[in-house]
Design a protein with these regions (language model features):
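Flexible loop/hinge segments at secondary-structure junctions
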Residues: 1-165
C-alpha cells in the first residue's frame, strides 16, 4: 500500500444552523448509543447542545451518515465514536454527496461526510478533541495533522514481488 492522498471527515449542519462547533464528547453523544468517548446523555434537541437562539432550543436533531459498506463509516466509528455503536436513528446513505444533500434539505440535520465533496447548502463545523479548541478542516490543518479527523488514502498494487511495476 502506498499513501497517495489525505482525506478528512467533516461534520456538517444545515447552512442556517447557528451551531458554532463541536467537541469530541458532543460528537460522540450525538451519534453514538454506547458513548465510549465520554459523551453525556444523547441530545434530542439543539437546545441540549446549548443553542439558545429563538426557534432552535426545541428543534429535534436529525442525524445522517454513511452506510456500513463505507470506509468513511468505519473511520467515523473508530475515530469519532471510539469504536462505539451508531444510534439506530442515523439515516444511512451510500455516498458522502447524498449525506450532504440530506443535511442541506433538513433544517434539523447533522451528518458526517468526506471533505472531498461539494458542500453546498451546509455549514462545515470546526471540531475539537478537547473541550472547545475547535479546528476547522482547512487544507493546511488537514495536511499538517492539526485537524483531528484526517486519514491517509492508499493505492494498493497487486503484483508479484519479483516483477517490475
Amino acid at each position: 500500500a502506498v499513501p497517495v492522498a489525505i482525506d478528512a471527515l467533516v461534520v456538517v449542519v444545515n447552512q442556517d444552523n447557528p451551531l458554532a462547533g463541536l467537541n469530541a464528547r458532543q460528537l460522540d453523544a450525538i451519534f453514538s448509543v454506547t458513548r465510549l468517548c465520554g459523551g453525556a446523555l444523547s441530545p434530542h434537541s439543539w437546545g441540549d447542545l446549548q443553542l439558545t437562539q429563538p426557534g432552535w432550543a426545541q428543534r429535534g436533531i436529525q442525524r445522517f451518515g454513511r452506510n456500513s459498506a463505507s470506509g468513511t463509516w468505519g473511520f467515523f466509528k473508530q475515530q469519532a465514536l471510539c469504536n462505539g455503536d451508531l444510534r439506530r436513528d442515523v439515516g444511512e446513505y451510500p455516498g458522502s454527496a447524498a449525506v450532504v444533500q440530506a443535511v442541506a434539505g433538513s433544517l434539523n440535520g447533522i451528518g458526517y461526510a468526506s471533505a472531498g465533496f461539494h458542500l453546498s447548502g451546509v455549514k462545515v463545523l470546526p471540531l475539537a478533541r478537547d473541550e472547545n479548541n475547535w479546528i476547522s478542516p482547512t487544507a493546511e490543518n488537514i495536511r499538517s495533522g492539526r485537524y483531528p479527523y484526517a486519514r491517509p488514502l492508499y493505492i494498493y498494487v497487486n503484483k508479484a514481488p519479483d516483477k517490475p511495476l
